[in-house]
Amino acid sequence: MQSKKLFLEVIGKLKDEEFEDLFSSLLSSSEMKDISRRLMAAKLLHKSTTYEEVQDIMGMGSNTVNKIYFKTKGSPILRKLFGRD
């Protein structure tokens, strides 16, 4: 749990333009791509795109889409972020 606390502390101190630098320093391009794709899938699900459509659009399996849905449904922060579109 110390690592999670450190992560949240560091994130809280960052200015907007520093996020990309931090994540580029810590994550491989593959990890960045995976996170970006999961975020896009969560957004599509938030916009009521069907599981099957998300699978086709994102090239993800049903288990991955299902996991993303259940981990993100009802998330206040995602509602706030995705509700702006």
Predicted regions and their residues:
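Short, Lys/Arg-enriched anionic-surface-contact patches
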Residues: E17-R37
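General nucleic-acid-binding
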Residues: M1-K13
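Short, solvent-exposed alpha-helical "recognition" segments
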Residues: Y69-G83
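Helix-turn-helix DNA-binding helix
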Residues: V65-N66
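Short alpha-helical "recognition helix" segments of helix-turn-helix
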Residues: E53-M58
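Recognition helices and adjacent regulatory flanks at domain boundaries
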Residues: K15-D16, G83
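Short, amphipathic alpha-helical "recognition" segments used to contact nucleic acids or chromatin
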Residues: I35-T49
